[in-house]
Amino acid sequence: MDEEPERTKRWEGGYERTWEILKEDESGSLKATIEDILFKAKRKRVFEHHGQVRLGMMRHLYVVVDGSRTMEDQDLKPNRLTCTLKLLEYFVEEYFDQNPISQIGIIVTKSKRAEKLTELSGNPRKHITSLKKAVDMTCHGEPSLYNSLSIAMQTLKHMPGHTSREVLIIFSSLTTCDPSNIYDLIKTLKAAKIRVSVIGLSAEVRVCTVLARETGGTYHVILDESHYKELLTHHVSPPPASSSSECSLIRMGFPQHTIASLSDQDAKPSFSMAHLDGNTEPGLTLGGYFCPQCRAKYCELPVECKICGLTLVSAPHLARSYHHLFPLDAFQEIPLEEYNGERFCYGCQGELKDQHVYVCAVCQNVFCVDCDVFVHDSLHCCPGCIHKIPAPSGV
C-alpha cells in the first residue's frame, strides 16, 4: 500500500506551523503573545456593527433545533443537545435584551418530522422554561429540513412586511429526510423574503450552503463551544433589511402600570389576557398593564393586544432597540506611551496598564479595553459624552 503523500488537508490548514504564532519576549515568556490574542478577540466585535444602514428592528425569528440521534455525540460536553440548549438559553436572554419588541419561536426536528416547542412569542421566560424541560428529550432518527422550514414558513409568511422574517437552524446531522424537493421550497422561502441562517455542528452540508445563499442568510460550522457561542451572538443584532421591504408607521400603545391594593375600594379584580394561551390557570388580579385602546389587561410588556391588535410597549423598549440604528462610533486606539493625559480609565477609574488606550473622538475621555468593550456591547453610549457638562453661557 502506497504511503499517503505528506500534504496538508484543507481543514488542517488552520493548525499548520502553529508555533510560528507564538513569540517569546525578552524574558522568554509567551504571556505577551497570549495577551495579544485575547486583546484582539475583545476588540473584534467593536468593529462588527453594520454602521448606519437600514435594519429590521421588529424581528420574527424561528430557531430550528436538530433533535436527531447525532445530538447525542459527545464532542461538545456533556453532549451536543445539552450544550445547545444551554447556549440557547443565553441566546434567548440576549436576543430579548437587544430586541425587546421582537418575537421568537422554537421548532424541534427528529424522526423525519418537525414540531413546535414554543409558539412565536415575546415572552423570554416561556422559551427558557421550555428549553430547560427539553434537556430530557430523547434524540433519535433523522432531521427534516423541509418539514421544519414548512412549519416556520406557515407562520412567518403572514407577518407584516415591515418586520424581518428569519429562521436560524442548529443542524447537527449530515443528512436530511424530506418528503419533497427542498430546492422548490427554497425558492418559495426566497419569494416570501424569509432569511434562513444555519449553524452546523458537524461539517458543511451542500443543501445548507444553497439554503443560506439563496435566502440571504449565513452558514457557519462551529470549531468548539466558545466559537459556537460566538456564532449565536452574531444573530442577536438585527440583520440589514432589504431595500424592497415595506416602510410604514406602526401604531403602538404605551400603557402605564397600574398598582392597586385590596384596601382600595375602587379597585376591581380582573383576568389577564396573557393567560388565554397559557397552561397556567387564570387568576383574578388587581394591577397590571391596561391597553389604552380597549382596556384589556396584561401582566407584562411588550405584547400584542389579543383584542384590538395594538402593539403594547414601554419607552425603554424602544430606546433599547434604537441604538442599533445609530451605533456608537469605535473609540480611537492610541499607544499608551503616546498618550499625555491622565493614566486612569474614565469608566472604571482603574490605572491604565495595557499597551493601548481608547479615546472617544467627541468628549476626548480615555478608556481601558474592558470598558471600551462594555460601552460598545452593552451600554451603547459614551458615559463621558452623557456627563459632559456644558460651560455656563455667562462665562
UniProtKB/Swiss-Prot annotation:
Family membership noted in the UniProt record: Belongs to the GTF2H2 family.
Xref: Gene3D superfamilies: von Willebrand factor, type A domain (3.40.50.410), Zinc/RING finger domain, C3HC4 (zinc finger) (3.30.40.10)
Zn-finger (C4-type) residues: 291-308
Tissue expression remark: Widely expressed, with higher expression in skeletal muscle.
NCBIfam families the record matches: ssl1 (TIGR00622)
GO molecular function: RNA polymerase II general transcription initiation factor activity; zinc ion binding
InterPro entries per record: C1-like_sf (IPR046349), Ssl1-like (IPR007198), TFIIH_C1-like_dom (IPR004595), TFIIH_SSL1/p44 (IPR012170), VWF_A (IPR002035), vWFA_dom_sf (IPR036465), Znf_C2H2_type (IPR013087), Znf_RING/FYVE/PHD (IPR013083)
Assembly information from the UniProt record: Component of the TFIID-containing RNA polymerase II pre-initiation complex that is composed of TBP and at least GTF2A1, GTF2A2, GTF2E1, GTF2E2, GTF2F1, GTF2H2, GTF2H3, GTF2H4, GTF2H5, GTF2B, TCEA1, ERCC2 and ERCC3. Component of the 7-subunit TFIIH core complex composed of XPB/ERCC3, XPD/ERCC2, GTF2H1, GTF2H2, GTF2H3, GTF2H4 and GTF2H5, which is active in NER. The core complex associates with the 3-subunit CDK-activating kinase (CAK) module composed of CCNH/cyclin H, CDK7 and MNAT1 to form the 10-subunit holoenzyme (holo-TFIIH) active in transcription.
Annotated localization: Nucleus
Cystine pairs: none
Outcome of mutating residue 363 to A: No effect on the transcriptional activity of the reconstituted TFIIH complex
Keyword Ribosomal protein part of the UniProt annotation: no
Keywords of this entry: DNA damage, DNA repair, Host-virus interaction, Metal-binding, Nucleus, Phosphoprotein, Transcription, Transcription regulation, Zinc, Zinc-finger
UniProt effect for mutating residue 308 to A: Reconstituted TFIIH complex lacks p62 and has no transcriptional activity
Positions carrying Phosphotyrosine: 95
Protein name: General transcription factor IIH subunit 2
GO cellular component: core TFIIH complex portion of holo TFIIH complex; nuclear speck; nucleoplasm; nucleus; transcription factor TFIID complex; transcription factor TFIIH core complex; transcription factor TFIIH holo complex
GO biological process: G protein-coupled receptor internalization; nucleotide-excision repair; regulation of transcription by RNA polymerase II; response to UV; transcription by RNA polymerase II; transcription initiation at RNA polymerase II promoter
Matches recorded under Pfam families: C1_4, Ssl1
Function description: Component of the general transcription and DNA repair factor IIH (TFIIH) core complex, which is involved in general and transcription-coupled nucleotide excision repair (NER) of damaged DNA and, when complexed to CAK, in RNA transcription by RNA polymerase II. In NER, TFIIH acts by opening DNA around the lesion to allow the excision of the damaged oligonucleotide and its replacement by a new DNA fragment. In transcription, TFIIH has an essential role in transcription initiation.
Domain called VWFA: residue spans: 60-236
